[in-house]
Amino acid sequence: MAHKKGVGSSRNGRDSKPQMRGIKRFGGELVQPGSIIVRQCGTKVRPGANVGLGRDYTIYSMIDGHVKFEDYSRTQKMVSVVPAEAEA
């Protein structure tokens, strides 16, 4: 007879936290400096005028203005921020 009791154990039960990637501000929306526009893996969306690119490829606004998306290539888009005064 066994003297040790069988102990059930699961090798599953781990999960990574979500990365919350995607478009955060859409075309035409008003943004302030530092506003995150896109969180992404790699440069699926390219940075244009008046935006910065973080080391994790996050695109953020550098000025006050409106978000503008344009086609960059067949598979990529480009995002820029147009100054609010220039729009009016």
UniProtKB/Swiss-Prot annotation:
Protein name as catalogued: Large ribosomal subunit protein bL27
InterPro entries listed in its UniProt record: Ribosomal_bL27
Superkingdom, taxonomy of origin: Bacteria
Record flagged with keyword Heme: no
Family listed: Belongs to the bacterial ribosomal protein bL27 family.
A GO-annotated cellular component: cytosolic large ribosomal subunit
One example GO MF annotation: structural constituent of ribosome
GO biological process, one term: translation
Gene3D superfamilies (alphabetical): 2.40.50.100
Region (Disordered) location: 1-22
Keywords, ordered alphabetically: Ribonucleoprotein, Ribosomal protein
Species name: Herpetosiphon aurantiacus (strain ATCC 23779 / DSM 785 / 114-95)
